[in-house]
Amino acid sequence: MESAITISNHVNLAFSLSRNPSLSTKNSAGISCIKWQRPCLRNLGHVRLNQQRKGTRRKSTLVQAVAVPVAQPSAFPPTDNTEHLKQLAERYGFQQIGEPLPDDVTMRDIITSLPKQVFEINDTKAWGTVLISVTSYALGIFMIAKAPWYLLPLAWAWTGTAITGFFVIGHDCAHKSFSKNKLVEDIVGTLAFMPLIYPYEPWRFKHDQHHTKTNMLREDTAWLPIMKEDIESSPGLRKALIYAYGPLRTWMSIAHWLKVHFNLKDFRQSEVKRATISLAAVFAFMVIGWPLIIYKTGIVGWIKFWLMPWLGYHFWMSTFTIVHHTAPHIPFKSSKEWNAAQAQLSGTVHCDYPRWIEILCHDISVHIPHHISPKIPSYNLRAANQSLNENWGEYLNKPKSNWRLMRTIMTTCHIYDKDGNYVSFEKAVPEESQPISIPKRVMPDYA
């Protein structure tokens, strides 16, 4: 997913890959850079093809075996690097921080390692996700209507999570992984986005660029990190960014929603017609749906039944997308340095959440396979992720949702410096960083 924050933070720490067979570490600003030997992964696709021809491909399970990358012997014991990554994982709230992916691994190598079944569209499963979202949303509205005031936050949390599922359904439609009928996808995607006041086509056009240029400086439309020049440009902007990346960070997708999707001048001429239709659908919901809600329940009812669940949706939109691509060890690269396979496999994070959240949100948190191929339907992401774990597991970033992970992101990953690592607001502008103390006080430091 996408998803959905205009400005994101990534550390300028990049695990340097070298053909030198030695392994060494050096520390800078509390974060270690690693040099390690590159495994020989050329001809990976050919090895797999030969296996298929010889009939060695496993047919009994969805997760199929392929040639697994194996590093050549190193001059230092591999436990050195393993122990170092374990220490980083503990510090940042991760279960695993992946080894650096070698330069000569390509997206084709990774995609061809996935079983063909994970790309197959199943209409029954697709419409099953719609049933789950509609049913869970209806239950949420019932809970809001019947709950006493002190239980309303729980009802809002459930309903906001349920309508996040609407976004994921539209997300599948935008990636052409919901139905083989493209008109059906356009209609379902538009309808799913309408109650979120999200214009479907404008989002789709911008989100496609996020996938083609993930973690690329200046180019990734969903992930544009704060740079030093942003902080230095204006006191007003600096103050706004400190608040936005402090207590308001888990709702920053609202800023992205407002800025990116409503100006037709931001789209190519060939995109304007479809963008206009989506905007008309959104405004129709506002003009018809909002007055109807207010007529039936009053302004308080509009707040209870629409606004609060909508804010709950944006909480998840922001949280998912922050965690998907933000960590002290995940680099942002210029277009000249950028490597597609490294950005999609190692620059993306798979995070486990409580299962009820994953069910209502259709496994959008299983995000690495989605970045390997957006054509994988949401209901096949777990099978694809299992295959990636079998064949590329050592390179994957894996946390479970926990306080230390969020505390690290919220209080550390602020200003991106091309010549160093993440710099927190507390270090860069200590006299103005009081808003950062709020999440620092509220969020416990345990994983």
Curated annotation (Swiss-Prot):
<dbReference type="InterPro" id="IPR012171">
    <property type="entry name" value="Fatty_acid_desaturase"/>
</dbReference>
<dbReference type="InterPro" id="IPR005804">
    <property type="entry name" value="FA_desaturase_dom"/>
</dbReference>
<comment type="pathway">
    <text>Lipid metabolism; polyunsaturated fatty acid biosynthesis.</text>
</comment>
<dbReference type="Pfam" id="PF00487">
    <property type="entry name" value="FA_desaturase"/>
</dbReference>
<feature type="modified residue" description="N-acetylvaline">
    <location>
        <position position="66"/>
    </location>
</feature>
<feature type="transit peptide" description="Chloroplast">
    <location>
        <begin position="1"/>
        <end position="65"/>
    </location>
</feature>
<dbReference type="GO" id="GO:0031969">
    <property type="term" value="C:chloroplast membrane"/>
</dbReference>
<keyword id="KW-0472">Membrane</keyword>
<keyword id="KW-0150">Chloroplast</keyword>
<keyword id="KW-0934">Plastid</keyword>
<dbReference type="GO" id="GO:0045485">
    <property type="term" value="F:omega-6 fatty acid desaturase activity"/>
</dbReference>
<protein>
    <recommendedName>
        <fullName>Omega-6 fatty acid desaturase, chloroplastic</fullName>
        <ecNumber>1.14.19.23</ecNumber>
    </recommendedName>
</protein>
<keyword id="KW-0007">Acetylation</keyword>
<keyword id="KW-0276">Fatty acid metabolism</keyword>
<keyword id="KW-0275">Fatty acid biosynthesis</keyword>
<keyword id="KW-0443">Lipid metabolism</keyword>
<feature type="short sequence motif" description="Histidine box-3">
    <location>
        <begin position="367"/>
        <end position="371"/>
    </location>
</feature>
<dbReference type="GO" id="GO:0006636">
    <property type="term" value="P:unsaturated fatty acid biosynthetic process"/>
</dbReference>
<feature type="short sequence motif" description="Histidine box-1">
    <location>
        <begin position="171"/>
        <end position="175"/>
    </location>
</feature>
<comment type="similarity">
    <text>Belongs to the fatty acid desaturase type 1 family.</text>
</comment>
<comment type="function">
    <text>Chloroplast omega-6 fatty acid desaturase introduces the second double bond in the biosynthesis of 16:3 and 18:3 fatty acids, important constituents of plant membranes. It is thought to use ferredoxin as an electron donor and to act on fatty acids esterified to galactolipids, sulfolipids and phosphatidylglycerol.</text>
</comment>
<keyword id="KW-0809">Transit peptide</keyword>
<dbReference type="GO" id="GO:0102850">
    <property type="term" value="F:acyl-lipid (n+3)-(Z)-desaturase (ferredoxin) activity"/>
</dbReference>
<feature type="short sequence motif" description="Histidine box-2">
    <location>
        <begin position="207"/>
        <end position="211"/>
    </location>
</feature>
<keyword id="KW-0444">Lipid biosynthesis</keyword>
<keyword id="KW-0560">Oxidoreductase</keyword>
